């Protein structure tokens, strides 16, 4: 076939805060719900006095300017996500990844989904997200939808996000220690690793 010239695709919805289209009021609808949790990591620690390991869960809307929305509620531009960001010590990340992968698979079974229509599939190297580290752990819980090829489509992903997000917020905010956890018993600070189960509530319907 004939190739066109490269074009830039915007996968985020752009809007303006307020009634006027003022460039200084440009805003974007969030493409995922997770970053609000990472941005408020320190606030949760200071107000709740939680100790690692602990998790922050939420459910909310996300928006993606999908190039080809299709398959009913499977791929849409507005969707509901339910996520857990579970903060752990780096040395315990593998054990917690295994724990949450098993827990989440069993949860889908517990609400009545037959094992015949459900599978757990580790992601390949080419599928890993930018925050995932090869070998750290990233799997999809998939359902046999009638409209997905080759028969299974993602219901939920369980990912070991390492300390990628907290380090990014620390670097770009200039407040490094704010995104570290202070271990009082060992008297040291470190960036926790994150295990993230992230499910599509619409797809689960």
PLM regions with names:
Residues 1-205:
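TRNA-recognition modules of translation machinery and tRNA-sensing kinases, especially anticodon-binding
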């Amino acid at each position: 076939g004939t190739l066109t010239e490269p074009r830039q695709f915007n996968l985020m919805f752009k809007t303006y805060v307020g009634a006027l289209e003022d460039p200084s009021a440009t805003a974007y609808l969030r493409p995922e719900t997770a970053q609000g949790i990472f941005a408020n990591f320190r606030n949760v620690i200071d107000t709740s006095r939680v100790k690692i390991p602990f998790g922050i869960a939420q459910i909310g809307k996300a928006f993606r300017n999908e190039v080809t929305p299709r398959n009913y509620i499977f791929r849409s531009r507005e969707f509901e996500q339910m996520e857990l960001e579970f903060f752990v010590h780096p040395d315990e990340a593998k054990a917690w990844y295994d724990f949450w992968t098993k827990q989440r698979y069993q949860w889908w079974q517990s609400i009545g989904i037959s094992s015949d229509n459900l599978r757990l599939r580790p992601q390949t190297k080419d599928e890993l997200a930018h925050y995932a580290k090869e070998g750290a752990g990233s799997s999809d819980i998939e359902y046999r939808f009638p409209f997905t090829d080759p028969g299974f489509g993602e219901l939920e992903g369980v990912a070991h996000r390492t300390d990628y997000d907290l380090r990014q917020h620390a670097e770009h905010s200039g407040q490094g220690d704010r995104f570290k956890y202070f271990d009082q018993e060992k008297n040291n600070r470190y960036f926790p690793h994150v295990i993230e189960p992230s499910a599509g509530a619409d797809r689960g319907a």
